Swiss-Prot record:
It comes from Homo sapiens. Residues 25-86, 87-149 form the LIM zinc-binding domain. Transcriptional factor that defines subclasses of motoneurons that segregate into columns in the spinal cord and select distinct axon pathways. The lineage of its organism: Eukaryota, Metazoa, Chordata, Craniata, Vertebrata. This is Insulin gene enhancer protein ISL-2. Interacts with LHX4. One of its GO terms (molecular function) is sequence-specific double-stranded DNA binding. Residues 272-301 are annotated as: LIM-binding domain (LID). Residues 337-359 have a biased composition (Polar residues). It is found in: Nucleus. One of its GO terms (biological process) is visceral motor neuron differentiation.
Length: 359
């Protein structure tokens, strides 16, 4: 709030305020003392010249026709303050208007069109589950895919072709580099890794059996050999890999459950916050800072002129006082002129005596 305070030290001889001395008002803008007829005071203790109260960005004068804001001792018009310090969309970095509907994810605010998964670009609707990872939105499917890749130890490795699943078989040896075998004609033999590709029918059969019994016996494995046409070794290795993968996933889920108290999930640098999208809400441009309202003010003698028209004041003496104030010659006149002029005025009610500047 900006208060308009009239600064007239020569009126100190009128009424009960004759014993008060005007304080020294210093302008915050230029740092000099204010000798104007009125000063602008920004609550609580910032005082300005009328010519110094302007926007620090565009130098627009701030008066009763606009709203201004104060931040770090600087004044801004509303347009520049919203542009510099207003809330912007976390996706497109564009500001909001008062009529925009927004989506919120913790401290981030998004346009409805910008509230999309950063991987598949699918728009997140109210009720959809998503996660917030490093200020990026992820839908539930893509977030689960990242967790599975991280659990498998290859976060960004390309997957197999659609419709076929790969199965890696371990080496027959101990995993060390093949050595020379002198007992076989002194020739080097290199072990090769066989890659077996399973079709959808074989994979469905193995998964159904695994769901019923993760550790099938020999009889069950023989039946699987007949049903799938795979070798016993391939079936044995598939069950081993499946159990190992499920064990890693179980350990991961336990780690996630232990961190639910902080609503965060983490895995090898992969951090995210599970959230549920709510309904769009109307954006309220709650900019930080103190709003400043510059009030309109009247000329210093307007109220006194209106009072004179409705009272029995001596008109010649009053007109002389008004013309004397407007000519600005009072500052160069002597103290005897002020005394003789004030003696011609009738007693003025205390309610009409302007108060000096409060410091």
């Amino acid at each position: 709030m900006v208060d308009i305070i009239f600064h007239y030290p020569f009126l100190g001889a009128m009424g009960d305020h004759s014993k008060k001395k005007p304080g020294t008002a210093m302008c915050v803008g230029c740092g000099s003392q204010i000798h104007d007829q009125f000063i602008l005071r920004v609550s609580p203790d910032l005082e300005w010249h009328a010519a110094c109260l302007k926007c620090a960005e565009c130098s627009q004068y701030l008066d009763e026709t606009c709203t201004c804001f104060v931040r770090d001792g600087k004044t801004y018009c509303k347009r520049d303050y919203v542009r510099l310090f207003g809330i912007k969309c976390a996706k497109c970095q564009v500001g909001f208007s008062s009529s925009d509907l927004v989506m919120r994810a913790r401290d981030s605010v998004y346009h409805i069109e910008c509230f999309r998964c950063s991987v598949c670009s699918r728009q997140l609707l109210p009720g959809d589950e998503f996660s917030l990872r490093e200020h990026e939105l992820l839908c539930r499917a893509d977030h689960g895919l990242l967790l599975e890749r991280a659990a498998a130890g290859s976060p960004r490795s390309p997957g197999p072709l659609p419709g076929a699943r790969g199965l890696h078989l371990p080496d027959a040896g101990s995993g060390r580099q093949p050595a020379l075998r002198p007992h076989v004609h002194k020739q080097t033999e290199k072990t090769t890794r066989v890659r077996t590709v399973l079709n959808e029918k074989q994979l469905h059969t193995l998964r159904t059996c695994y769901a019923a019994n993760p550790r099938p016996d020999a009889l069950m494995k023989e039946q699987l050999v007949e049903m799938t046409g795979l070798s016993p070794r391939v079936i044995r290795v598939w069950f081993q890999n499946k159990r190992c993968k499920d064990k890693k996933k179980s350990i991961l889920m336990k780690q996630l459950q232990q961190q639910q108290h902080s609503d965060k999930t983490s895995l090898q640098g992969l951090t995210g916050t599970p959230l549920v999208a709510g309904s769009p809400i109307r954006h309220e441009n709650a900019v930080q800072g103190s709003a400043v309202e510059v009030q309109t003010y009247q000329p210093p003698w307007k109220a006194l002129s209106e009072f004179a028209l409705q009272s029995d004041l001596d008109q010649p003496a009053f007109q002389q006082l008004v013309s004397f104030s407007e000519s600005g010659s009072l500052g160069n006149s002597s103290g005897s002129d002020v005394t003789s002029l004030s003696s011609q005025l009738p007693d003025t009610p205390n309610s009409m005596v302007p108060s000096p500047v409060e410091t």
